[in-house]
Swiss-Prot record:
High-level lineage: Bacteria, Bacillati, Actinomycetota, Actinomycetes, Mycobacteriales
Recorded topology in the membrane: Multi-pass membrane protein
Boundaries of every PTS EIIA type-1 domain copy: 542-646
Catalytic reaction annotation: N(pros)-phospho-L-histidyl-[protein] + D-glucose(out) = D-glucose 6-phosphate(in) + L-histidyl-[protein]
A GO MF label: kinase activity
Domain remark text: The EIIB domain is phosphorylated by phospho-EIIA on a cysteinyl or histidyl residue, depending on the transported sugar. Then, it transfers the phosphoryl group to the sugar substrate concomitantly with the sugar uptake processed by the EIIC domain.
Protein name, per record: PTS system glucose-specific EIIBCA component
CDD domains noted in UniProt: PTS_IIB_glc
Organism: Corynebacterium glutamicum (Brevibacterium saccharolyticum)
InterPro entries assigned to the protein according to its UniProt record, in alphabetical order: Dup_hybrid_motif, Glu_permease_IIB, PTrfase_EIIB_Cys, PTS_EIIA_1_perm, PTS_EIIC, PTS_EIIC_1, PTS_IIB_1, PTS_Sugar-Specific_Components
Amino acid sequence: MASKLTTTSQHILENLGGPDNITSMTHCATRLRFQVKDQSIVDQQEIDSDPSVLGVVPQGSTGMQVVMGGSVANYYQEILKLDGMKHFADGEATESSSKKEYGGVRGKYSGIDYAFEFLSDTFRPILWALLGASLIITLLVLADTFGLQDFRAPMDEQPDTYVFLHSMWRSVFYFLPIMVGATAARKLGANEWIGAAIPAALLTPEFLALGSAGDTVTVFGLPMVLNDYSGQVFPPLIAAIGLYWVEKALKKIIPEAVQMVFVPFFSLLIMIPATAFLLGPFGIGVGNGISSLLEAVNNFSPFILSIVIPLLYPFLVPLGLHWPLNAIMIQNLNTLGYDFIQGPMGAWNFACFGLVTGVFLIALKEKNRAMRQVSLGGMLAGLLGGISEPSLYGVLLRFKKTYFRLLPGCLVGGIVMGIFDIKAYAFVFTSLLTIPAMDPWLGYTVGIAAAFFTSMLLVLFFDYRSDAERDEAKAQMAAAEQTNNTPAAPAAPVAPAAGAAAAGGAAGATAVATKPRLAAGQLVEITSPLEGHAVPLSEVPDPIFAAGKLGPGIAIEPTGNTVVAPADATVILVQKSGHAVALRLESGVELLIHIGLDTVQLGGEGFKVHVERKQQVKAGDPLITFDPEFIRSKNLPLITPVVVSNANKFGEIVGIEAAQADATTTVIKVNGAE
């Protein structure tokens, strides 16, 4: 039997249109990222129907992101094992000539889109190394906090053990230009190893022996200004762009038979001097200019910047536009010795983590297993790792109301950050573990706590869903609940449903757990709760109902406008929005009637509810009336699933098709358990 990992991976690939529709595949901390040839054949709804998928986000006209959470790397590796996908191991499709094919983002602002995509895809592959290094920094800062060793002391004043520990994180940042050069070249379609070799040449002992940063030396008879390229990001980015054009020109000039030898030879021969003389200093100037501009804004009003940054992040992250800011943070550390973006960014992160913590507490109270899992994963990934994507895609982007709970937390946290003028002296991901990296760390702690608890309390007091979404969730939980305990039994005996087996009921019982009353061989026939055409559930254009995940049954294409009780029953749940009602019949059968699809978004308009929860109803009593024409005018399907939500208590359950069904037509037969 295939594992869940394999099944989900196959499900994603199949609904993306298969390997033939994919031109590129990569992943970041939480998302699988695809470029596809034809976005129209991607079945986003079907991909999202898998419980392991947190969300599906289109990008431009050819990009697709599938949000998987912290286990994304496992799914990425599993998809690579599938037929037709092995050649995507380097991210993009490769022909026999090794020339990479890239579809890219295409749209009205394709140039701007691609610029941001280029920066984002350059830094994403380096994320793991940056995360690891940031936690090593945190350990050293903690040692400083507890008075064990000064983090900022010169290396010649530190014990050998701490010098070695510093080398563990400095390896990532010192050689960052090499990593950036490789990933930037790969993104552009140039040779990634040549892209890495160009900045590497400027970090060699031989180059460093030429002199100190700021010195001018003569090379090839020309003056060369020396710079410290360790930790720089803009020089390798610009060098990679130059390499792309040089390689492209060389491949037009050099015969294919000898390109493998002479293209890399001339690329290195041209690009290393070009970078050392021109592109490198220019890149440092660009980085310093951006850093100085932001520093001027920060010096003018740290308070304003501290508020603007956390309020912007919730809108940048879904678009992937936050990644380029990492380059600016690193540049600030290289230029100024500190960074003023990471502190305020922590306000956004902890407002986000506070929000999902509130969602988790509500899910615990409601016994909502699905939301409990999603919110717990987002909470742990955030508080311990500083990763916000699981929270963003698992909760925030699925429930529109959440932004009204999130932004006040961002604002309050940003105000506190501005008051304390928070600075970071190392590049870290803002989590509980990296608090000591901020200065003053106590002020930063107050800021993230303010952001966290503001958003969490807003969720607890006002919920994270609209009234209709909350009712929808409760209806689905009631429908999916398949336990022996059920809501209170009626206060007085009620006659059994027509066609049901006789049932005994204790008069005067008020809070008795009702058990199914169908023995083996007994049968209950359920009539249609509304007039219309009875069709198989498989015809419902919703993967959850069509697959029977909420229970077996039948679907009705309404010709009338009233839902009635098919038998004597107790209303166990009814939506305020009127689009769904759940009943427990005297036989113990629990029935969910869901009027139309996506009708929750109407917020009750077009529906009139005639009953309330725990009310006793007789066969034929009206439950809900609705306006079919109004619903159709909103382009919403009216097909109404009628499903048995506690099917595991019974034997075979059969839906019966009918060209015209009404209150006298049997549409579902439920057999007693063997």
